[in-house]
Amino acid sequence: MEKKDLKIIFLGTPEFAVESLDKIVENGYNVVAVVTMPDKPAGRGHNLLQSPVKQYAVSKNIPVLQPVNLKDEDFVEQLRSYGADLFVVIAFRMLPEVVWQMPRLGTFNLHASLLPDYRGAAPINWAVINGDTKTGVTTFFLKHEIDTGDVIDRMSVEINPEDNVGDVHDRLMSLGADLTLKTLGKILDGTLETKPQSAFADECQSPRPAPKIFKETCHVDWNRSVVDVHNLVRGLSPYPAAWSIIEDDGPLTGRHVKIFETQIDSSSSTNLIPGRMIVIGKDKIAVDCSDGRLLIKKLQLQGKKAMPADEFLRGAKLVNPRLI
């Protein structure tokens, strides 16, 4: 079979999926349709915003389907009418069985972790939050239970100590596109071999979950270790960002603050009071954790833009400040 003879439907929504879709198209595969989320109102004018995947598909004149309900009979029949051989899913919704069982060659998904570790909605965030030094991407065939299907292939990448989740996201986006193309090549030339996720038990005896990130997940508990808090900030930056509330004897009390960049203070700290803010000179902010002190390098006060600590201090009046 030639690339142009393999009819593919691509299902995805965010920027993370676009690089893989672009690689599929530019390498001569036949993407007959794209499925993505409906346009959403955005901004003050509530103008409809197209998903990054839709924007790309429109630019390439690829038909776009935007179902509200993936079980809708009209949508399912429209999907079936394309006669696709294969579905490729990247950063999309959970698919009903009637959809993922449709193509004769199956439906494979690209997941941003080394499965079976970090099944769930936010694998990149949790790998950084947990202080991992390695992560990766996995392609696997869909089955009933989410993120549990047989593995086609995996590729790994290092997480550097200074990386935040945005850095790792971009690295995995590129690596994922390479793996998607490699997986399609195996399907096309008949060299595909899969392994159950249990085959990776020697390196992942207790798979960790990667649940969706909620506002409560992002709230900093200053009673935790300095390493834990530092990794939480890294794992949520630049979006959605770790946050805390200023409590002090001045005008900023009760204001929310987002924290984007931190650094562990290597000097020994004594008499720690978790949450206490300490202004060092005119340009540094330190906060006590349970076992050490964390320097806040970039933050955003509620209603203001994000800024370095020195700029924040020039405009902020802090009186016995604490973070809660």
Identify the residue ranges that each predicted region occupies.
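Short active-site oxyanion
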Residues: 6-9, 83-87, 218
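Structural motif corresponding to alpha-helix initiation and N-cap regions
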Residues: 18, 50, 72-76, 93, ...
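N-terminal Rossmann-like dinucleotide-binding module
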Residues: 1-44
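Short beta->alpha connector loops
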Residues: 13-16, 68-71, 91-94, 265
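Donor/substrate-binding cores of folate-linked one-carbon enzymes
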Residues: 15, 26-30, 37, 86-209, ...
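Internal anion-binding site segments
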Residues: 202-324
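Conserved beta-strand segments of alpha/beta enzyme cores
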Residues: 7, 30, 61-63, 106
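N-terminal glycine-/serine-/threonine-rich beta1-alpha1-beta2 phosphate-ribose binding loop
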Residues: 41-85
